[in-house]
Regions:
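Glycine/GP-enriched mid-protein hinge/lid loop-to-helix segment characteristic of carbohydrate kinases
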Residues: 2-47, 51-52, 117-118, 131-202
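Glycine-rich phosphate-binding loop and adjoining helix at the ATP-binding site
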Residues: 27-71, 75-141
Length: 202
C-alpha cells in the first residue's frame, strides 16, 4: 500500500502532491501467502452475477491481512480526509472480482474512515490529468498504461476520462484475452512478464 499526502487547490482545481510517501507491504505479515492463487475470473463473475460470492478460506485470510494493513496505514496518518483506491471490480460495499488478490466484499464496512473505494486505474489517470506534476494535464485524447503487479489503464477522449463502469463495451487489459487464452495483462505487466520468463526458461 502506498500512502501519499496531497492538497487540492480550489483555485486551479489541481492536486498538489506532498513530498511525504510511505509504503506498507502485505508480505511483512507473517501469515501472508505469497503463492495465493485467486479463483478463475469467470467463476468470480458468475458468483457475483448470481449474488452468491463464495470466498475460500485462504481468500478470507488474505483479505483479513489486506484489511489489517490498510487499517495500520490509516491509523498512522495525520489527515482529516482519506481517499482509497484499489484494484478489482467493486460494488457499493467492497471488492467483488479480483484478478491478482483476494476479494473483500465487505471492504468498506470494515474500514470506517472511508465512504467509497475508488478504482486504482481510474485514480492513476486522474492523477496524471489533474495533478500539478501529471504528464497528461493538457491531453485531449490519449491512452494511459502503467505497469506493476498488473496493468493500470485508462482512456481520455476530448479531455474527459472514460468511465469503464459506465461504458461497458470498453474492456480493461485484464479482461482482454489473447489467442492462447491468456489475459493481455498477464502478458504485458512487469509481474506477468517475469512470471512468463521464469516459466519458459525452466
Amino acid at each position: 500500500i502506498m500512502v501519499q499526502y496531497a492538497t487540492f487547490d480550489n483555485r486551479s482545481k489541481k492536486i498538489i502532491p506532498d513530498n511525504f510517501q510511505k509504503e506498507y507491504f502485505y508480505s511483512d505479515h507473517a501469515k501472508w501467502k505469497h503463492d495465493f492463487i485467486p479463483k478463475p475470473i469467470d467463476d468470480q463473475r458468475i458468483e457475483y452475477s448470481e449474488g452468491h460470492i463464495c470466498l475460500t478460506d485462504t481468500e478470507i485470510k488474505q483479505g483479513n491481512i489486506v484489511i489489517e494493513t490498510v487499517t495500520k496505514a490509516i491509523s498512522e496518518l495525520n489527515s482529516h480526509s482519506i481517499g482509497l483506491c484499489f484494484p478489482g471490480i467493486k460494488n457499493k460495499d467492497g471488492i467483488v472480482v479480483m484478478a491478482n488478490g483476494p476479494r473483500i466484499p465487505d471492504f468498506k464496512k470494515r474500514i470506517k474512515e472511508i465512504d467509497a473505494i475508488y478504482n486504482d486505474s481510474d485514480c492513476c489517470v486522474i492523477g496524471e490529468c489533474h495533478s500539478t506534476i501529471g504528464k497528461l494535464q493538457d491531453a485531449e485524447n490519449c491512452i494511459y498504461i502503467g505497469g506493476g503487479t498488473g496493468i493500470a489503464d485508462g482512456i481520455v477522449i476530448n479531455g474527459e476520462i472514460i468511465d469503464f463502469n459506465v461504458v461497458h463495451d470498453v474492456k480493461r487489459s485484464w479482461e482482454l484475452l489473447t489467442q492462447t487464452g491468456e489475459t493481455v495483462e498477464s502478458c504485458l505487466s512487469p509481474a506477468g512478464m517475469i512470471e512468463r520468463y521464469n516459466r519458459l526458461s525452466g
